[in-house]
Amino acid sequence: MPGYHVPISGPMMQNPYHSLGHLGTHPDQSYLHASKTGKGCKKGNRDCVYPDPPTSKSSKSKDNTSQKTSPKSSNDGEDADMDRVTNSLQTILDEDEPEELSSEERSDSQLSGSKATGSSNRNVTTRQSTESLSPDGIKESSPSVSTGGSSVTVAPSIDLNIPTDGRADWSHLPSDYQHYLNYFVENITSFHYSIMHDADDFFGTVLPFLAVQHEPLLNAVVGFATYHATLQNPAGKLQDFLKYYNKSVTLLLESINRKEMNNILNLITILQLLTIEEYFGDWINLMGHQKAAFQVIRKIFTPDTVMHTPVGRACIDWYTRYDCYVAIMGGFPTDLPREWFNRMNEYNESQLGASPDEFRWKISSRSTQLRSISYDMSMLYARGSRGQIGPEDFTKEHKRITNELLEWKSTWDAALSVPEYLVTDFSYQRDVVPGDIVNPYMLGLLYEQPLFTNTLITTEWTSIMIMHLSQSSDIPAEQVFIEMAKHAYTICQYFETVEFWPLKPKGALIPLQPCISIAALFLPRDSRHQMWVRRKFALLDTMGFIHPTTRRIKMAHLFRDPSCAHWWLPNDEGLTPILQAIRTFADERNTAAVNVQQENIREVRHLFAKMEAAELALTTGNDVTGHVLN
């Protein structure tokens, strides 16, 4: 099998479940050519400990105001929850940057109209409904709702009355905030959040509208817009983004310290900050955000109530994507139990039953089904890596999930495959060049709206198959590697199909970033394939999706080219000053992992281990399961 032979380093897998704690090793640090700064990474060196959630907490009826006026809460469970959220967020502020905006950039009197914490919100609207909602998505009926040993506190209601034109009024805000909010609605889509299907147009309409109500969220959303705008500005400065990001973090911590955790606007703020950390490749802080979001979700939602409103549905979709992704990549269980995923499926099925011809519910149903399978995968891998399941049971469950994945792929609703939405005009097709590795103009891959999600979710399914194959314990490594290589080519084809389509939605390549990163590990090692991958990685970096230092070092070792640890392309092609500044900033935040789980995620050790095991089998004639290769 020419092209796959690479020197093997590091220990091989010690058990059939590919435990993530001991797979792979760091290459020589001399591969890292990125310039060093004099500052240490305050975030990376801080040890964050996330206690297990309490088994129960007492019900309470006090509102936020009474909590704020009392120096100490009599509810120990409440204080514990607050501490968990605060601890989970403590790492995220960039302490080397100023926390306040300059007087020219921020007017307290102008922003005061938008400043709202848990107990005081301006009335707003939604075009989907004019019903009165509490910030947790539960219709107000009583001060506290019992949920089997825990309580959900109902905070004052917000009326979501979004104007018919779908635009919020932010004319009272400072000009820079207005500018970046306008940029957000014109240029940022759900795809920038790696959300492939936004059934309620949450990211396009609701999110900017909610941001105007809550200053921490406002600064997070404006910061996200500024980040993307700055990348496209040759004269852009890192501080242009950081001033909003730091302000959001500061205000969020202040809000939480005032015991205002049960506030859906704080939850959305945390999720927005979490998204920013994903762009930085900052898994240390990302996991802190995730833990904080989990604590807030379990405080203000139940599996049933979360599906009652567009805001709740968007939050749970947003959160569970991270919950499953982080769990699978790190080899540990999801935080949310299966019940939450079941309710998502049941809700979408009920909506589909009521409106069987609506594309959005068909697509939502497909998406949540795949998310539920991802949940099953994460739980199996976690049990396997911890020795909580025997080899035979692991193999049986692995096969069951394999069958579920194959069934998901083969049972698409015919309405989602209607040919009228297939892209058939490839007049933009370019000539074949020597560096090409796939045909991105094949009919049947690319759908236009409203079925464009088909193209993205099929790519995601293919990457999930690679992840699942990497955990197989009873198939010869060579066979698994060949199957993963086939899937890798498919991902590359889909990626380039979307990349070259002139009519692709804004941000359409962002959800494919994890897919192409996984595929890159299982392509041939010749210079043609390597340069193809490096160009795609460079493209994603220029979009703001930064590959962290440890990942670049791994790929430099894989490609046997130390320069990749500095930049993907020769002669710093495409490495603009602002991109270099952002990458340096991201590198500082990624200096050190604070626990084993975070290091596992940063390095995707189990995938590198599977690849190395297969290559060892090819070079020695034996695979790690004991099979002799013919």
Where is each model-derived feature located?
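Intrinsically disordered, low-complexity activation-like regions
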Residues: 2-261, 284-630
